[in-house]
Amino acid sequence: MFAVMEIEGDPLSWYKLPGAVHEWLEAVGGFAILGLIIWLIFYIVNPPSTSQRKVGLSTGAWLTWSTLLAVLIGLSPIALAIIWDSLGLSDATEVRSTRASWTRHLNVPFVSTVMPASAAPKKDFLYFLYYLASCWAIAAVLVPFIVGVSRLRFRRIWGLAKLSFKEAIRRRVLWAFSALLLVFLFASWYLPHKPEDQVRGYVGVVSFVIQWLLVITASLLASFSIPTDMKNQTIHTVVTKPVERFEIVLGRFLGFTMLMTLVLVVMTVLSLIYVARGVVPEAKEESFKARIPVYGDLKVQSIKEGRVAEHGKSVGRESTYREYISGGVADEKATWIFRDLPSNFAGRATLPCEFGFDIFRTSKGKFENKGVQCKFTFMNWKCPAAADSREEAKLAQEFHQAAGAEQALHDFARDKGFYEIRGVEVVDYHTLAINVPGELFQDLAEWKKQKSDAPPLTVVVRLEDLSQLLGVAKYDLYLLEDPGEESFWQNFFKGAVGTWFHLCLIILLAVTFSTYLSGIISWVVTMVLYLGGVFVAFVRDVASGQTSGGGPMEAFVRISQGTNIVSPLDETAASVKLALEADRVMIFVLRRILNLIPDLARFDMTDYVAQGFNISLFFRDNSLALRTVLLIAYLLPWAVLAFYLMRSREVASSS
């Protein structure tokens, strides 16, 4: 039996890729403009002869003029907004802060403008100028990078990669962390023995141990490699040969990645054997699956102060992931609308519908340690009740009057497009299933042909028990395109690819920082970024000011004063003023560096394996191909930064 898996953010989808590329260009463009400004200051401060030796005269001239043009385009919206206001074309009483597109969506560093409200018709044009400036900055940075990449030769990179591979094997850090795996062998003593929990426990433990051991090992190897070579001056044997500086970076990255990939494959095989031997046969039969779900959109309706509200009730919990509906009220319901269904649903005798909800109890006694009763109503695109609650009640009455043989109910579902199940027991946070008659999907091909606006399937859930509340979320109910015939073993290896993504990310970060920083500083900065990615959701809430109780300094004041998070503070006190101002500065900085932090949750697929959901390779949401695109999009700017840092580094330095 599976528990309920919470999916906080929307899945990665191919149809969102164009918008993601647009936002990526704006975000990277903001950093590119900032980098060009820093480079220009460096170019002015240093004598021309020094700059020529480091980056070359032609590159310096190109970047200088590109920086000036990017800054000119980027600042033009501010000038236009000021001119627009000074000419009296705006209402001075209506002024609101409007951010550039990338800062508005992604909080990356550039500028904020004050634009008159009446200047809204010109706003899109001003955003276009910001977008143009960011794209130009990216092009300016990429031109020298592309020229440098054209000189690379794979034979030299491969030779450096093999050298890095051999050096890493000889280092003690690899074997020291491998020895910690002995502790991992005793983890089964502390894992749950109930069959329904075993697979989740074993998969979670092995994934956690493998990921953190390999990540720490890889970060140490990559962070100290180039600084150690520079300190020992062994890098001179490489740079004196016809080798590009960037080839050293790529060789290190490729060599360490190959080594950690080999270790990951071995550990994944051993972990799979460990899971297979440790799990009892009952758990294997029940949980060794790789199901393919089909999700719908959720619409919750409740009654608040005698009126119908298009949202659920709050039960006072800190998490807002789920909305709640009351039992015994016909107008309180949760509706899942499936706007597209796979063609292979047609022709099936039955189709599994799985669900797992939260139960909030308002009374104790006979309801404790028991489930609640729910009513499930299924309506296809031909059913008029899908858009009219009165028709739904009428059809429900006809349906239950026709109740008798199971085939009669299936015939009713085929003719009327309506099927209802009452008295379905729902257990708190446990995944259960009911079978939906395939007659509801017989005309699916006709629906696709007609391109009807009506959804092919609507599922309505109501709680029948009084004095109880049912918590629902979008991903709590789904149809199964495949009930789990996909191999669990294949899914386990696909889940390990998520750990490989983590390794690629941290190796490139460490190598990039090590091109200009000492070994220990490179490792600290790399781990700070990585740990920020682990807690990126919390960091995002802090940066947006959505955390309860204020920022870090305000929270410290509340703890020291023994004040809860909802009580107002005395803002006239000097300590409170200082804390609030410190939080404003911290939030300002966090907003500007937020896009530097990787969203590691996007690469973690442990829950999918543990909860028995298939990890798609290419065409579905959250596929490995989509995650690979996301990884490349994050690593590419860091690779460009490593290119410039390595070219500007004085190799003779012993620091």
What is the meaning of each model-derived region?
Residues 2-52, 74-133, 191-197, 278-485, ...:
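Terminal transmembrane helical anchor/hairpin motif
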Residues 3, 7, 146-159, 482-486, ...:
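Short, membrane-interfacial amphipathic segments enriched in basic
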Residues 56, 161-165, 169, 226-255, ...:
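Helix-loop-helix units of permease transmembrane domains in multi-pass membrane transporters
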Residues 151-174:
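Aromatic- and glycine-rich beta-strand/loop motifs that create alpha-glucan
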Residues 166-179, 520-525:
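Membrane-interface helix starts
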Residues 169-177, 213-214, 245-272, 508:
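Selective transmembrane-helix segments that form parts of the transport pathway or gating/packing helices
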Residues 206-228, 263, 267:
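Long, hydrophobic alpha-helical segments
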Residues 521, 530, 648-655:
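Short cytosolic juxtamembrane segments of multi-pass membrane proteins
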